[in-house]
């Protein structure tokens, strides 16, 4: 079990393995920076060696049994675990609050690798609804397509789908980055509060509907804009950031980012209580 580091008497929440949030307005939430992340541990975390690798066949296991076995392997110091025969099971790899390389050889069902912090996961097949929901930090890569609500309520980390994703991708996201190599469905970025979404292909109707903050970049066609979603000028820093992200994500590094459209919140929802009745109707 890892020792807790950098604990402060001023923060009992740290000793309980909780994140400290600095709130600015309703949208700005900082959990920890990259330097703090190296020294951050949840209570009960395991010291794992990424070079220590093993395989786990879950063909005849239910999800709770498989997740418990993953926890047991981490307790033995395994830092890289290859999951064989996931066969579209729901809720595999959820709730992992530990640094770990997790490779799924196949497809996942609903809620795969949800509520994780510090996990690096790769899924060679497809994923169902709500993959990586509430991701706090880490990296999740889906090699094929993803279902609806991809990355719902994520707060940090990188979530990558090399194929296409369903409706409501990034719904209620509060941080982090979602990268889609193909198309995205309707209501992408619905009610997003912070973070960034990159879609290289087309997006469906009501893009960014009711978004409060955050940024969406689209390389293809847009079905329609949602309420309070507006276009903004693409800056040189935006282009540099997009190039870096696509390179790290290993998705179409030669994509011409200068042709991408940038969508942000029009900020009407920030001042909703001060709007006239006719303006309120147009803001929601």
State where each predicted segment sits.
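Acidic, glycine-rich active-site loops and adjacent beta-strand->loop/helix elements
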Residues: 146, 165, 184
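Beta-strand repeat architectures
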Residues: 70-80, 91-100, 111-119, 130-137, ...
């Amino acid at each position: 079990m890892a020792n807790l580091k950098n604990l402060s008497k001023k923060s009992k929440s740290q000793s309980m393995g909780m994140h400290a949030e600095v709130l600015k307005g309703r949208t700005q939430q900082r959990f920890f920076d990259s330097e703090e992340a190296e020294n951050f541990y949840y209570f009960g975390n395991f010291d794992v060696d990424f070079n220590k690798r093993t395989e786990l066949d879950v063909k005849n296991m239910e999800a709770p049994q498989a997740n418990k076995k993953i926890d047991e392997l981490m307790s033995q110091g395994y830092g890289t675990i290859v999951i064989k025969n996931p066969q579209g099971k729901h809720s595999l790899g959820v709730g992992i609050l530990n640094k770990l390389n997790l490779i799924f050889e196949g497809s996942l069902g609903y809620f795969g690798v949800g509520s994780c912090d510090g996990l690096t996961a790769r899924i060679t097949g497809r994923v169902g609804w709500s993959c990586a929901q509430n991701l706090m930090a880490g990296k999740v890569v889906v090699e094929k397509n993803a279902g609806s609500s991809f990355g719902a309520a994520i707060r940090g980390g990188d979530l990558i789908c090399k194929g296409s994703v369903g409706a409501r991708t990034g719904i209620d996201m509060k941080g982090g980055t979602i990268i889609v190599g193909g198309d995205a469905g309707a209501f992408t970025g619905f009610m997003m509060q912070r973070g960034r979404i990159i879609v290289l292909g087309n997006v469906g109707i009501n893009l960014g509907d009711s978004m409060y903050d955050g940024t969406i970049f689209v390389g293809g066609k847009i079905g329609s804009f949602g309420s309070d979603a507006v276009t903004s000028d693409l800056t040189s820093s935006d282009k540099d950031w997009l190039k870096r992200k696509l390179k790290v994500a290993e998705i179409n590094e030669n994509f011409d980012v200068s042709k991408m459209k940038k969508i942000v919140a029009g900020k009407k929802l920030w001042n909703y209580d001060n709007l006239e009745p006719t303006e309120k109707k147009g803001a929601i």
